[in-house]
């Protein structure tokens, strides 16, 4: 977005909040497709002539306004030429440009708030693994957790109402309604999972923006309750919330909810309440009793239905005891268990033993869902037996090995925080044997005969465990260093879940 300022003249729109004219600016659509990073490309690209593109944009918007949504059937919507149902290039350009333009007011507010507060960004907080050190520190001291499936809005108008408090351009909001209705089935008043799936695939950037705006409103209540109940205002909380909320609206939350919640219920003023979220799933953990957790459950359901006008029911929130149930979160099974330890104390001439059993958060690789993902990708069958994977005949043996090695490394990298490595070793075994069977099938041989025929160094890198690299690089590495590597490691460069790991 920093590169866009020279083209979009954001200082002018900062004062007037007029976004509608940007729809008719040629460079908005060029920037949406990556042509704006070099200003000379705008002049050299024949397909982006100002006059012709402006006429295309006007024609598409006029066509959209003239549609009669009351007579369009479900079959007709599949053949709708707008928004790329027939993969029309100009419709795609218009929708992508719209997605960039609608982000401008939020980007300006984020920049101004960061400059005023002098907040230093910590990009390591973007890593998925940065959540687990927080869980390891807090969850062993908590008793119950509420697994929450975040509800989706029942009508498209809710998304427009969410944005109208921040986007002041009425013409632009009016056009936004037509965009949203065009993406959905016009004969349906309720948003379905199928329409959401089509929406997210046809324009992922626009979908993510609307989803983050909606989640931002949903999570605002948690920040408001924290500010009302907390006596110590930690400066780090603003930085952490910047990653979750994206737009830094702490002052705005206090104004919005102060009138709606003049008196905060006592059970909401819980200093031991902790909240984490990833995508559409969140966890609310507390040291409260089951009675208070059920009050939280009832409160959240009523809040969603009455204040945010979204459909929800009690079954979307499951309350579990942390010591007896595992959390299925971020493709890990996490549970709190006691870790017994014996400590020997020496006082003068007397010595005695102390039995200590502190709670510890266990993070385990979900072996059954992961084998299901491998079976779906044709690496093994349903019970985990490795099979040969169909591959292109023109690929060399080294290319096939490198592809399997890349998958194995990615999985090992993501599950490096597992407290038990046994399940990960089984997954590696499936991938390695599947690679051998794939190569044997290519050479029209059996796996055993193929291994006898090739050189032992052929699979050396593929069969070398990650822990063995420490010994190869540092031959005299200490025992403590090797033990540290065999433990849990959380990486700060993982920003998304591997496709095979994402079984949720």
From Swiss-Prot:
Keyword Plastid: yes
A GO term from the CC aspect: chloroplast
Domain of life of the organism encoding this protein: Eukaryota
Record-level Gene Ontology MF annotations: RNA binding
Assigned keywords, A-Z: Chloroplast, mRNA processing, Plastid, RNA-binding, tRNA processing
Function description: Usually encoded in the trnK tRNA gene intron. Probably assists in splicing its own and other chloroplast group II introns.
UniProt-annotated location(s): Plastid, Chloroplast
GO BP: any one term: RNA splicing
Entry similarity comment: Belongs to the intron maturase 2 family. MatK subfamily.
InterPro entries, alphabetized: Domain_X, Maturase_MatK, Maturase_MatK_N
HAMAP family: MatK (MF_01390)
Protein name: Maturase K
A matching Pfam family: Intron_maturas2
């Amino acid at each position: 977005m920093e590169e866009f300022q020279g083209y979009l003249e954001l200082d002018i729109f900062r004062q007037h909040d007029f976004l509608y004219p940007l729809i008719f600016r040629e460079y908005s659509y060029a920037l949406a497709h990556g042509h704006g990073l070099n200003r000379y490309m705008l002049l050299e690209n024949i397909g982006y002539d100002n006059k012709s593109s402006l006429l295309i944009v006007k024609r598409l918007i006029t066509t959209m306004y003239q549609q009669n949504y009351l007579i369009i059937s479900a079959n007709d919507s599949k053949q709708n030429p707008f928004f790329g149902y027939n993969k029309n290039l100009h419709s795609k350009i218009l929708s992508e440009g719209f997605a960039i333009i609608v982000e401008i007011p939020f980007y300006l507010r984020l920049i101004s708030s960061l400059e005023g507060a002098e907040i230093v960004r910590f990009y390591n907080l973007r890593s998925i693994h940065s959540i687990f050190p927080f869980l390891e520190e807090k969850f062993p001291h908590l008793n119950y957790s509420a697994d929450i499936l975040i509800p989706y809005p029942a009508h498209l108008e809710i998304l427009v109402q969410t944005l109208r408090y921040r986007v002041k351009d009425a013409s632009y909001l009016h056009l936004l309604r037509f965009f949203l209705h065009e993406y959905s089935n016009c004969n349906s008043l309720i948003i379905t999972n199928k329409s959401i799936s089509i929406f997210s695939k046809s324009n992922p950037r626009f979908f993510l923006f609307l989803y983050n705006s909606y989640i931002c409103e949903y999570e605002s209540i948690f920040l408001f309750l924290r500010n009302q109940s907390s006596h110590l205002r930690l400066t780090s909380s603003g930085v952490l919330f910047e990653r979750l909320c994206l737009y830094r609206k702490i002052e705005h939350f206090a104004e919005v909810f102060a009138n709606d919640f003049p008196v905060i219920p006592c059970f909401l003023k819980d200093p031991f309440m902790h909240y984490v979220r990833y995508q559409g799933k969140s966890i609310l953990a507390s040291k409260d009793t089951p009675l208070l957790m059920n009050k939280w459950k009832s409160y959240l359901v009523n809040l969603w239905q009455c204040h945010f006008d979204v459909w929800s029911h009690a079954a979307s929130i499951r309350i579990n005891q942390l010591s007896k149930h595992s959390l299925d979160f971020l493709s890990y099974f996490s549970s709190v268990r006691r870790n017994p330890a014996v400590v020997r104390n020496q006082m003068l001439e007397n010595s005695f033993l102390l039995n200590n059993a502190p709670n510890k958060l266990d993070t385990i690789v979900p072996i059954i869902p992961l084998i299901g993902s491998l079976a779906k990708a044709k690496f093994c069958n349903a019970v985990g037996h490795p099979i040969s994977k169909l591959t292109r005949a023109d690929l060399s043996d080294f290319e096939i090995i490198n592809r399997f090695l890349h998958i194995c490394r990615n999985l090992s990298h993501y599950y490096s925080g597992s407290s038990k490595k046994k399940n990960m070793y089984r997954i590696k075994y499936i991938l390695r044997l599947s690679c051998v069977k794939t190569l044997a099938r290519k050479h029209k041989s059996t796996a055993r005969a193929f291994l006898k025929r090739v050189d032992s160094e052929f699979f050396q890198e593929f069969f070398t465990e990650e822990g063995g690299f420490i010994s190869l690089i540092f031959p005299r590495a200490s025992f403590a260093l090797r033990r540290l590597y065999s433990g849990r490691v959380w990486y700060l460069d993982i920003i998304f879940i591997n496709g095979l790991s994402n079984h949720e």
